[in-house]
Amino acid sequence: MAVKTYSAGVKEYRQTYWMPEYTPLDTDILACFKITPQAGVDREEAAAAVAAESSTGTWTTVWTDLLTDLDYYKGRAYAIEDVPGDDTCFYAFIAYPIDLFEEGSVVNVFTSLVGNVFGFKAVRALRLEDVRFPIAYVKTCGGPPHGIQVERDVMNKYGRPLLGCTIKPKLGLSAKNYGRAVYECLRGGLDFTKDDENVNSQPFMRWRQRFDFVMEAIQKSERETGERKGHYLNVTAPTPEEMYKRAEYAKEIGAPIIMHDYITGGFCANTGLANWCRDNGMLLHIHRAMHAVLDRNPHHGIHFRVLTKILRLSGGDHLHSGTVVGKLEGDREATLGWIDMMRDSFVKEDRSRGIFFDQDWGSMPGVFPVASGGIHVWHMPALVTIFGDDSVLQFGGGTLGHPWGNAAGAAANRVALEACVEARNKGVAIEKEGKTVLTEAAKNSPELKIAMETWKEIKFEFDTVDKLDVAHK
């Protein structure tokens, strides 16, 4: 066996980390980066630099390389592809041995894949487009506390999307008035109401008061309707200790579901909370506040499909996923891709939807995608078509903005939803025939009729900033 010797100095990254002959192992974590190199840096060197800086490399040769099996532990840039329609950047595919990462730690995965490498001078911009987590790593993660089927059983709701609403105005209401709004929405026909992402424990409404008034509203609406109801109580807090204190109180008063802002709250806190929810029989709703800071720039950051995968591993029963038709960013095909990534047990590579790798989730439960943001009754046919039954459709302004009040807004949405589901089940192409379906339903629902008149001119027709790259042929 040849004896390794140390040779000091700086050498090109490609000499160690560019390996086009490498065939990825089933146990490797695979990443696709979109790299925009600095002028004068060729593709192979840029790809190798990213592989090095996100795994074992540093800027110079170090003698301690001789104390480990560098060839085993290093990341390997094994393929490069053009980005269709954009010659300023390219895709680089990198394989990482599974032993580089702590088991069950999305924190550790992100620290490597999107850590210091994103400030590396050799690249002008860098975006993590997709990650393949091998089943060997998936099995080390807790995943959703309960998942879609368990939630349906807990809430006793089957055969349709779940219906929700974000209480508005999101800030400024007293706890008592907040609880009143919750009650009216639930009594009117919604399954859930929710805190908005920035409702924590402010001077105008402390968390414990909110929890108490909301629980009173839930219990009253359940008695009157005979249906299970819930409200996503946001337990996001300044410290993990305070977060768990709020979660424990929610459990104590009988709340079925709590909520966490998983990006601003942090992945460590989220994984811990998901584990707590699993142990304590609580459902967990996840808000994605701050995601667009990371995912909206098409050349730099982290694609939302990666944030979706990370959340499924970290744990959550719901995740906001965009609407396609509402006020928030979201290309239709890309959205369909990450919705499947949230719910399905196996997802095939499909470049037309931005999916770069097969992803096997094994027996890990799925996550409810949550459509929320600028939607109203006219969007219902498209939402039911796009998201299917295993989803949560949340109408904030589209409920509380009803001219007759919250209960009427909730009733309008419930009637619209059930009309669309019934028509779909009869074979009607509801996205195409939606106007007819809703108009017919409105004949027996004055609340729906008024809602349709109120929002008939409201559209959000802005071009998508982060478009899918043209599919490879």
From Swiss-Prot:
Catalytic activity: 2 (2R)-3-phosphoglycerate + 2 H(+) = D-ribulose 1,5-bisphosphate + CO2 + H2O; D-ribulose 1,5-bisphosphate + O2 = 2-phosphoglycolate + (2R)-3-phosphoglycerate + 2 H(+)
Entry's transmembrane regions: none
Cofactor: Mg(2+)
Keywords: Calvin cycle, Carbon dioxide fixation, Lyase, Magnesium, Metal-binding, Monooxygenase, Oxidoreductase
Co-factor binding details: Binds 1 Mg(2+) ion per subunit.
HAMAP family (alphabetical): RuBisCO_L_type1
Protein name: Ribulose bisphosphate carboxylase large chain
